[in-house]
Amino acid sequence: MGIPVEVLTKFIGQKVKDVYGRDAGVIVHVYTEIDGTITGIELFKGEEIKTYSPNSVKVDGDSVVILPDWKTDSLKVLGQMEKIRKRQRALEELYSRQEIPKSTYEDMKRKLDSELLKIRDEHSRLKGRLKDRLNSIEDQVAQIDRAMIALKINYISGEIPELAYKNSMEILRLSRDSYALERDDIKKTLDKLDGLDKEVIELKPSASLNTSTEQSNKNEGNKSEVSVPIPVRVINTL
């Protein structure tokens, strides 16, 4: 169930953060349908206005947090792949127990395979996006580390006062920590995507039905191997 519009509209005009503690902007508008269904949330940050989907917004206690686009899309793909996996297992189980005919099995298998193909295409593109974001984060962390080192040098050399040094270091530390949280989250998400993809199984014909077919073929083969009497011709030599 989505967030009730009455709850979200209370945060209009307020600053919100993302799930990693960074400023995401100010909620300036909530788009809704006549029935109250939320269709989008508009945030203003700096000089930019961005519209987020309802799935990108989560109420956390007395505050609202924003999910990055990659996380929203990852949750969607993971959910779809999990559903496909469960349906595959259910179909295979029914077929192995001979509770559905082969024609129904093959028809449903084709549909599942078609859906799986689409999801795997999206899965592949998503992994590419996550890896790109991971590289971007690594660059940001490296830049923050360089800034922290330069700041320490300037402080130790007496070029900046202690208060300015502490304030700047705290800002850099919080920024680095938030990037580290996102980096770890992306790595875990990539692991989940890889793991679930391996669990999505290729359906195979029932073992019991295979055994029956093999037994039938074996019986047919045995029939062909039954010994046939060799005709004997007796020649009278008297």
Swiss-Prot record:
Effect of substituting V232D: Loss of interaction with CdvB
One biological process term in Gene Ontology: cell division
GO cellular component: cytoplasm; nucleoid; plasma membrane
Subcellular location: Cytoplasm, Nucleoid; Cell membrane
Superkingdom per UniProt: Archaea
Keyword Disulfide bond among record annotations: no
Induction annotation: Induced around the genome segregation and cell division stages. Down-regulated after UV irradiation, indicating division inhibition in response to DNA damage.
Role this protein plays: Part of a cell division machinery. The CdvA, CdvB and CdvC proteins polymerize between segregating nucleoids and persist throughout cell division, forming a successively smaller structure during constriction. CdvA is a membrane interacting protein that recruits ESCRT-III homologs to the membrane.
Keyword Cell cycle tagged: yes
Quaternary structure, from the entry: Interacts with CdvB.
Keywords in alphabetical order: Cell cycle, Cell division, Cell membrane, Cytoplasm, Membrane
Effect upon mutating V234D: Loss of interaction with CdvB
UniProt source species: Sulfolobus acidocaldarius (strain ATCC 33909 / DSM 639 / JCM 8929 / NBRC 15157 / NCIMB 11770)
Gene label: cdvA
Recorded topology in the membrane: Peripheral membrane protein
Protein name as catalogued: Cell division protein A
